[in-house]
Every structure is written in C-alpha cells, then in structure tokens.
C-alpha cells in the first residue's frame, strides 16, 4: 500500500529501496532498506554532519540533495522539513571518467 508519504518514492526509476526518517526514526521503508535501522542511524548522522557545513547564514539546510555513490548503487538523500528521504538506486553501467 502506498501512502502520501511514499507515493513519489515508489515511482523512481531503478529504485532498490527507500527510507523516510524523522529525527532518526524510520517512518516508512521498503526494498533493500526495509527496516534498516543501522542505515537509518548512519544516514541521520551523515545529514547532521553535512548540516554543520553552513556556507551562508540563514539557510535551513545547506544542501538540496546528498549523494553517496557506491560501486553498484547510490544513496540519494533529500531533506524536506523535518523528514529525510533516502532512496537506494541501481547505478547504470557507464564507463568511468578518467581525471
């Protein structure tokens, strides 16, 4: 069953799972991230740390989206109000970029 809280998350292409957090507590979860309290805790700490890097005074959250890229998947983190939305997406096969 899809709630208003998660209906957009269900439709994200290549989505492997999601978490919806509020103050570190899991409000909703699915797929690979279903009931993953360890991931929820780590992501909450990551968001808290990232929020400490304020470049401009007055910004409520200093970033729009935080991406953590692993070999085969990426965690996309978005903060909206008091909620943290996390989506685990499958990385599409691309050639590595040489820098």
From Swiss-Prot:
Modification(s) after translation: Phosphorylation at Ser-67 by PKA inhibits Ragulator complex assembly.
Protein name: Ragulator complex protein LAMTOR4
Family: Belongs to the LAMTOR4 family.
GO biological process annotation, one example: positive regulation of TORC1 signaling
One term under GO cellular component: lysosomal membrane
Residue list for modification Phosphoserine: 67
N-acetylmethionine: residues carrying this PTM: 1
PANTHER family the UniProt entry points to: RAGULATOR COMPLEX PROTEIN LAMTOR4
Alphabetical keyword list: Acetylation, Lysosome, Phosphoprotein
Modified residues (N-acetylthreonine): 2
Annotated compartments: Lysosome
Transmembrane regions listed in the UniProt entry: none
Name of the coding gene: LAMTOR4
Primary location group: other
Function, as annotated: As part of the Ragulator complex it is involved in amino acid sensing and activation of mTORC1, a signaling complex promoting cell growth in response to growth factors, energy levels, and amino acids. Activated by amino acids through a mechanism involving the lysosomal V-ATPase, the Ragulator plays a dual role for the small GTPases Rag (RagA/RRAGA, RagB/RRAGB, RagC/RRAGC and/or RagD/RRAGD): it (1) acts as a guanine nucleotide exchange factor (GEF), activating the small GTPases Rag and (2) mediates recruitment of Rag GTPases to the lysosome membrane.
Subunit comment: Part of the Ragulator complex composed of LAMTOR1, LAMTOR2, LAMTOR3, LAMTOR4 and LAMTOR5. LAMTOR4 and LAMTOR5 form a heterodimer that interacts, through LAMTOR1, with a LAMTOR2, LAMTOR3 heterodimer. The Ragulator complex interacts with both the mTORC1 complex and heterodimers constituted of the Rag GTPases RagA/RRAGA, RagB/RRAGB, RagC/RRAGC and RagD/RRAGD; regulated by amino acid availability. The Ragulator complex interacts with SLC38A9; the probable amino acid sensor.
